[in-house]
Amino acid sequence: MTSDLSSKHCESCEGIGAALNSEQIKNLLPQLNTKWEVTEDNRIIKRAFSFKNFYETMAFVNAIAWIANIENHHPDLEVGYNYCRVHFMTHALNGLTHNDFICAAKIDKLLVD
């Protein structure tokens, strides 16, 4: 997994135009950690993260919030005591854009597997 996506920044949704097609998604996915999955309808990328305790989970969630704020692109999160599930989709286009992959790559940089 080598990615320069993490060094890029998100574009305004108004300037993107259209969601990515399946070929574009297929080309971008290998640039992320292999634990990221694309839903069958190609509208969402998602990944589950596990932690030792609530404190580590919330520290991770806060780091995601910081990235989301800086990039002005926000994931859907499901958070529990020792887990966080992250889902990215560009809601304005009802599908995936480069923004989703950029933010996923930035999240990948937070943790060492």
UniProtKB/Swiss-Prot annotation:
Q: Which reaction does it catalyse?
A: (4aS,6R)-4a-hydroxy-L-erythro-5,6,7,8-tetrahydrobiopterin = (6R)-L-erythro-6,7-dihydrobiopterin + H2O
Q: Which cysteines are joined by disulfide bonds?
A: none
MF terms from GO for this chain are:
4-alpha-hydroxytetrahydrobiopterin dehydratase activity
Tell me its EC number(s), please.
Answer: 4.2.1.96
Keyword Lyase part of the UniProt annotation? yes
Superkingdom of origin:
Bacteria
What GO biological process term is on the record, naming one?
tetrahydrobiopterin biosynthetic process
Q: What class of enzyme is it?
A: lyase
Keyword field contains Lyase: yes
Q: Which key words are in the record?
A: Lyase
Against NCBIfam families, the record matches this protein to:
PRK00823.1-4
**Official protein name in the record:** Putative pterin-4-alpha-carbinolamine dehydratase
Organism, as annotated: Legionella pneumophila subsp. pneumophila (strain Philadelphia 1 / ATCC 33152 / DSM 7513)
